[in-house]
Amino acid sequence: DGLEKIGMETGPLAVWLWNELKKRAAPIVCMDARHANAALKMMPNKTDRADAAGLAQIVRTGWYKEVSVKSHDSYLIRASLASRDVLVGVRVRLENQIRGLLKTFGVMFGKRVGGFARRAEEIIAGELDVAPEMRMIVETLLNARNDINEKLKGLDKRVRSLARTSAPVRLMMSVPGVGAITALSVVSAIDDVKRFRRSSDVAAYLGLTLRRYESGEISRTGRITKRGSKLTRTHLYEAANALLTRNLGQSDLRDWGLRIAKVSGFKKAKVAVARKLATILHAMWKANLEFNPKGAVA
C-alpha cells in the first residue's frame, strides 16, 4: 500500500523482474542503465543502498529515460536466433581449426564440390600419410562439426516454423535479400510496430546511424553508433550484402546502393542499405504493404 512507482535499471534480470512485477500489477518503470548511471555517478558513496536511494530519487523527479521491455514471444524468438548464431560461430571455428592443423602438415584444404565434409573425408582417407596420427584429431573435430550441423537443422526448422506463422515476417520476406532469419530478427527487435512513430527512428535504435560531433567550429561525422542489437544489425548487413551482390532482381533500393558503392566502396554501401532496410521494413510492417521494387529511396 502507498506504493506509487517502482524503478529498475536494464540488466540481465530486468526481463524476468519486469514480467513478475507486471503479473502483480506493480507500477514499474524500466530505466536506461546509461542514463541512470550518469545520475548515480554524482553520489559520493558507491553502495547498493546508495544506488537504491539514487534510483528512487531519479524515479521521483522523473529524470530518466524509460525503456520498452519486449514481450515474452519476442524474447523466445531472439533466444532461438542467438542460439543459432552461437552454433554457427562454433562451426566456423571448428572448420578453421581443421584447415589450420592440416596446413601445418602440408595438406591444403581448398574447395571441392560437395562441401566441407566431403573434402575432409577425402583428406582423412588418402592425404594424411605424412602424419597418420592426425586422422584421429581431424575425425574428432569433424564429428563435432557434424553434431553442430544436426543441432542447427533443428533450430533452422524452428525458425522456418516461426516465420510461417508471422504475418509481418512473411511481409518483410518480400524484400530481396531478406530471409526468415533477418525478418524474425527485425520483428523481435522492434516487438511492437507502434513503438516507433517514425520509421527512420528504427535505424537509430539499431545503431545504424552515423555519429555526429559538433563543438564551436568543429563539425564531423563518424562511424555508425553500433547501439542496440548487434545481432539484428548483423542480419541487416548480411541482407544488404545479398541484395547488392546477388542477382535477386532489380529495384530502386539496389540501384541506390550500387551508386553509393561506386563512390564510397561496397562496405559503406552495405551499411547504407542496411540502414535503409531498417526503415523500409518498419514502414512495410506499419502500412501492411509488400515491398515495392520501384519505391522511392530518399
Positions of predicted regions on the chain:
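Basic, amphipathic alpha-helical segments enriched in Lys/Arg and hydrophobic/aromatic residues
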Residues: 258-298
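Short helix-capping/linker segments at secondary-structure and domain boundaries
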Residues: 62-65, 94-95, 152, 191-195, ...
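Short, amphipathic alpha-helical segments that act as regulatory/interfacial helices
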Residues: 56-60, 81-84, 88-91, 95, ...
